[in-house]
Design a protein with these regions (language model features):
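Structural preference for solvent-exposed beta-strand-turn elements
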Residues: 1-232
Length: 232
């Protein structure tokens, strides 16, 4: 095991510019697909998962533009097939379930990888999306979701406060028809960050940072876009 030795006794001074938090950046790039107008996410760190996210976006038909530390996305027709090589490299590929289901009408995703924290199943994601009207076919290697018409509002309680499932269902609720209540949700800062981004694009989300999220859905894509700098 590597060791880092720090010798103190010296004063520190100066300033640093913290990069945006990966836990916010990755779901924000997926959430940008829900916007009907161009979006920009700034302060993006040069991480492997960010590069994988850009590859995923290009694979489904998006055209992300990376300029310095800013990623820009404009609405384009999308397909719902996530390549196995991309999904297997990054746990955050699960964030694209709801956006691609909404944009393409169907999404097929090989089971995601990239996680060193042990198995983290996606059953809450799938159960919540099924409650909103999606049909779910889950196999040993991949999962396929389809919808007929817009997703519908629900009053849904998460089995446990999963951050990923909270983000997935929040994105779905923002574009569903009607007024959705999500109970027992995660309260991490990235939930608040993604909610702020979606609200800037025209969503109506309240309660981020509390155990209950309420959302008045747009019944389709959000009407606007947003420029957003994620939390550090």
């Amino acid at each position: 095991m590597e060791t880092i030795a720090i010798t103190g006794g010296r004063g520190l001074q100066g300033c640093i510019r913290p990069a945006a938090a990966k836990n916010s950046v990755l779901p924000l790039l997926a959430a940008a697909l829900l916007c009907g107008e161009p979006c920009a996410v700034s302060g993006v760190p040069p991480l492997a998962d960010v590069a994988t996210s850009l590859a995923l976006l290009r694979a489904v038909g998006a055209a992300p533009e990376l300029q310095g530390d800013t990623i820009r996305l404009a609405p384009r027709p999308l397909c719902g097939d996530i390549p196995p090589a991309v999904a297997g490299a990054m746990r955050a590929s699960v964030f694209y379930l709801a956006p691609l289901l909404i944009r393409a009408g169907a999404v097929t995703m090989p089971l995601p990888g990239g996680c060193r924290l042990g198995p983290r199943p996606i059953d809450i994601h799938l159960d919540g999306l099924a409650a909103m009207g999606a049909s779910v076919q889950a196999g040993a290697q991949a999962v396929t979701l389809r919808r007929r018409g817009a997703l519908h509002a629900v009053d849904y309680t998460l089995r446990l406060p999963s951050v990923g499932a909270t983000l997935t269902l929040l994105m779905a609720a923002a574009c569903a028809e009607g007024y959705t209540t999500l109970r027992g949700v995660a309260r991490e800062p990235e939930i608040q960050d993604v909610a702020a981004f979606l609200n800037a694009a025209g969503a109506e989300i309240a309660g981020a940072g509390t155990p209950v999220l309420t959302t008045r859905g747009a019944g389709g894509l959000l009407p606007g876009g947003a420029r957003h700098t994620p939390l550090p």
